[in-house]
Amino acid sequence: MANASYNVWSPLIRASCLDKKATYLIDPDDFIDKLTLTPYTVFYNGGVLVKISGLRLYMLLTAPPTINEIKNSNFKKRSKRNICMKECVEGKKNVVDMLNNKINMPPCIKKILNDLKENNVPRGGMYRKRFILNCYIANVVSCAKCENRCLIKALTHFYNHDSKCVGEVMHLLIKSQDVYKPPNCQKMKTVDKLCPFAGNCKGLNPICNY
């Protein structure tokens, strides 16, 4: 079904920026416990998106959080490094420099970050490394000022706007009900072969070092 006349909404778009008279396509996974799907719901884009009015979308975004959302938010909370990456929107180097300057990353994460930086194609068999890096960042970095929007935009540029890579970031940082952790240090050394200095870092997981 054509969707050329509809705006595709993403979590990066604030409620205040919506056109209440427009029509949007949204991912229902972004509104778990808030949006009810029925047999009459019309899906678009191969069954991934649903159509919604701008006014209703505004109501969903400004509605008080549900009990499940509060529980999930409390579960996700942990000490993180508060870093605004708003300026990291012009290429890979800015993102890498910012992370290197602001976080005391373990050697395995530094290696992954540099491997992804040097790789001209964001995919190319790099899924495992992307997953580990994204999980690490999701667990140790946040931006209270931008509500993580700057972080998502920075990673979007880092991955050259590749739709699959950006989708992975959105899932881990926004849509997932749980915050995935990177593999523990033992697996990083024996399975992923990415840990050159086993036993020299704090804790049993890369996220213990930041």
From Swiss-Prot:
It is found in: Virion; Host nucleus; Host cytoplasm. Signal peptide: none annotated. InterPro entries: Lef-2. Keywords: Capsid protein, Host cytoplasm, Host nucleus, Transcription, Transcription regulation, Virion. The keyword Transcription applies. One of its GO terms (cellular component) is host cell nucleus. It comes from the Viruses. Pfam families: Baculo_LEF-2. Belongs to the baculoviridae LEF-2 family. Plays an essential role in viral DNA replication. Does not seem to participate in the initiation step but is rather important for the amplification of DNA. Also required for expression from the vp39 and polh promoters. This is Primase-associated factor LEF-2. It comes from Autographa californica nuclear polyhedrosis virus. The lineage of its organism: Viruses, Viruses incertae sedis, Naldaviricetes, Lefavirales, Baculoviridae. The gene is LEF-2.
